UniProtKB/Swiss-Prot annotation:
CDD domains: homeodomain. Belongs to the paired homeobox family. Bicoid subfamily. A motif (OAR) lies at residues 301-314. The lineage of its organism: Eukaryota, Metazoa, Hemichordata, Enteropneusta, Harrimaniidae. GO terms for cellular component: nucleus. This is Homeobox protein orthopedia. It is found in: Nucleus.
Amino acid sequence: MEAASLHVQMHTASDPFLSHAALNNNNTMNKLNSAVLSQGVKDEHDNNDKLSLDSDGTTLLKDTSSGHGGNDGSHMGCNQESNDDKPLKQKRHRTRFTPAQLNELERNFAKTHYPDIFMREEIAMRVGLTESRVQVWFQNRRAKWKKRKKQTNVFRTPGALMPSHGLPQFPSSMGDSLCSFHTNDTRWPPMPAQMTSGPPLTLPPTLPRQHTGIGQSLSGHQGGGGGMNQSPNGFGSGISVTSNGSVQPSMYQSFGGGMSSMSSMSSVSTSSGLPSSPTNVTVNSPMSCSSPDTGDMWRGTSIAQLRRKALEHSVTLNGGFR
């Protein structure tokens, strides 16, 4: 008993923390602390594991998403820069003009095709449009007008579409019709005068009976009275008419079987009471081909003499009919 009490006294007297109760309490506290620490360590490990899982899963996804987001941002930045570099294409709005506006614009276009800035502004105020719209309308209208004018000029000039053969117009007077037509067309061969003789021409009954000799049909070699050969086309041919009634033989060209009507100069002059003049009227055309024996006679005459003689012959014929 004494030993136990001594032992207790020794422990309690020396230091209260060195007693068994205190030591036991300290041991329990240490155990509790160690348990708490171990529990805390376990909790930390669990938390670390959870963080690692989260980092493997969600955090990485966040990083990847942030990375993608960064890439998207960079791409968007590049696109914005490229869009800033390229000018934005504006949508073109087609202007619809009312009939009243078109009438006003057409009326001003009839006045001038090139209005100045002041006139365009005045027109824009009247029709309720902008000056730029009015300017564009005038530009389009001028282009349309030039195109239409060009087309009309092309259709008006037939020489631009088809070649011109340069055929002269038929003259009105008898002398011009006999002598002024010249051509180098040699497609038709010459025909003798005997083959071109046609049926006799008849005169209306109103003319006197003494003029019936005009309608007689005579060939170039058989006719006794001098006259004039006439083709249906109105072209003159090689004829030599003298006052004594002799007809020089000639070969001329006929288109589609011409009519040959020869009138007597002597009968015309006698019936009209005019003296017969010794004028030798000769009508020749470059289209006719003279016979070889009369070539020298035709070669010596000139165009001026032929026209003058043809005119005298026409005056003589007109005087005879009067």
